Amino acid sequence: MTSPDFQHHYVNLKGVRLHYVTLGQGRPMILIHGWPQTWYEWRRLMPLLADKFSLVAPDLRGLGDSSRPSKGYDKKTVAGDLWNLMHDHLGFERFIVVGHDWGAPTAFRLAADHPDAVTHLAMLDAPVPGDLPQGAGLGGAQRWHHLFHQVPDLPEALVYGRERLYLEWFFMAGTDQAGVFSDADIAEYVRTYSQPGAMRAGFNFYRALPQDVADNRELFATGFKLPMPTLGLGGGGSRGRADLIVQSLRRVALRASGGAIADCGHFIPEEKPEELARQLREFLA
């Protein structure tokens, strides 16, 4: 389901065509989705914030209804797309950044590269790459896919024609309560990830992790810390990573807060949109 008030747009940026959705009026905020999702993961949250915020929810390069470049899936490049969207195209001089899953490391990089423009940063259920010891945060058997998706070519070959089976497993395994995703919700995600090149693009977000780690560690070596207020939230369920995220932000930011959302798994914006909206409003007050 989508609200009739959602406005869909396309913009040609440097080397990529982005699809993005807008809703609301007020302080500008970009919502950055993760894998295996699209802008659609924010559909329940956006109406809850639209009275106070101008919300922008893009499909990241390679995903959703955006174009699928063959390269550029490191989070510094992906964050550059979003800077071009928010600052150069939409004209926002200062804005709030919220990211979930792979959107969280992208959000971190956007804030790190433009600390004077990003007023607040919220990261949902994903830590900062390069801050943790090698292998930390992968979650062992729970997050086996982090390594599998980095294998060249094989994931694409095995998943081809089985996109729904593969993606639906993550949606079911990653939630703390039954019934979060309807058949229509899953069909919308499968629609975009079944398009040519979409699964490869999604896996490329994982394959870029070594570059993300190197880029961030180069930044940390300078002593840099995020100056804006930061919020780290994780699901309190078995697949949530609340403590890991908050500890990570405390090491890389001057002002960090956060914690766990109870009875929630990985997919916070869809499992607990009302609680997420409440915590974001409190953080941004």
Located regions from the model:
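Short strand-coil-strand connectors
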Residues: 12-14, 33
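Flexible "cap/lid" subdomain of the alpha/beta-hydrolase fold that forms the substrate-access gate
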Residues: 1-9, 16-18, 28, 56, ...
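A short, glycine- and basic residue-enriched loop/turn
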Residues: 38-39, 105, 264-265
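Surface-exposed alpha-helical interface segments used for non-catalytic interactions
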Residues: 40-43, 47, 80, 108, ...
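Catalytic histidine-centered segment of alpha/beta-hydrolase-like enzymes
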Residues: 264-273, 277
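Conserved HGGG/HGGXW glycine-rich cap/lid loop of the alpha/beta-hydrolase fold
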Residues: 21-65
